[in-house]
From Swiss-Prot:
PROSITE patterns: BPL_LPL_CATALYTIC, LIPB
Protein source organism: Nostoc punctiforme (strain ATCC 29133 / PCC 73102)
Protein name as catalogued: Octanoyltransferase
Protein's job: Catalyzes the transfer of endogenously produced octanoic acid from octanoyl-acyl-carrier-protein onto the lipoyl domains of lipoate-dependent enzymes. Lipoyl-ACP can also act as a substrate although octanoyl-ACP is likely to be the physiological substrate.
UniProt superkingdom: Bacteria
Entry's Gene Ontology cellular component terms: cytoplasm
């Protein structure tokens, strides 16, 4: 159980998962979202996991930012309903999918994006690093290198998708795209500043900082029967 320092917390179920195929995680998110649309009283959720190598595009993404032929089928590519341009997921990148009812917090998408950034910035502070925001962009940077990408979808004020923090990934996959459509700002990973860092150790701090920023009490849980990976 992880509590924020604030009283009167909302409960939030924490699903700490390992390596999960992207489409399984996406289907799981949709299931959790739909349940909460039909029953808004259900507890919020934070999923933490990693993905096998996969490229995802937001619903309005420009395929010009992809440097390979999607039709060749050489790489796993999926277009989904989040905002933002193309991004890359792989082992060593910690992905967070909050399923939150923003009516419990603030019905403001800009506020929500800044809160997700704040979670990452606080995690970096734990390691003595100063995360930065860049005006007009969403995400978190370290010394000019983007270490966290954020893309969300909200339906009836309930969120899905979320953030991806580059902890210790193989960065070669990013060379095949223009990450997030930003050509003049390189991507980076925490391992460049903290050799030997792992997703396993970062998970705790991400959960802790998430609880603090959103004022929730995290209850570590396991997926129920409705989630059966295909």
């Amino acid at each position: 159980m992880i509590r924020s320092k604030e009283p009167h917390n909302n409960l939030c179920l924490l699903y700490n998962q390992g390596l999960m195929p992207y489409l399984d995680a996406h289907r799981w998110q949709r299931s959790l979202l739909n349940e909460r649309i039909h029953d808004p009283s259900l507890d919020d959720v934070l999923i933490l996991l990693e993905h096998p190598p996969v490229y995802t595009l937001g619903q309005g993404s420009n395929s010009d930012f992809i440097k390979f032929d999607i039709d060749q089928g050489e790489y796993d590519v999926h277009r989904v309903e989040r905002g933002g341009e193309v991004t890359y997921h792989c082992p060593g990148q910690l992905v967070g999918y909050p399923i939150l009812n923003l009516q419990r917090y603030r019905k403001d998408l800009h506020w929500y994006l800044r809160q997700l950034e704040e979670v990452i910035i606080r995690v970096l502070t734990v390691y003595g690093l100063q995360g930065e925001r860049i005006p007009a962009f969403t995400g978190v940077w370290l010394q000019g290198r983007k270490v966290a990408a954020i893309g969300i979808k909200v339906s009836r004020w309930i969120t899905m998708h979320g953030f991806a923090l580059n902890v210790c990934p193989d960065m070669k996959g990013f060379e095949r795209i223009v990450p997030c459509g930003i050509s003049d700002k390189p991507v980076g990973s925490l391992a460049e500043w903290i050799p030997g860092i792992t997703c396993q150790e970062v998970r705790f701090y991400v959960a802790q900082c998430f609880a603090e920023v959103f004022g929730v009490e995290l209850i570590e849980s396991q997926p129920q029967d409705f989630f059966r990976p295909e």
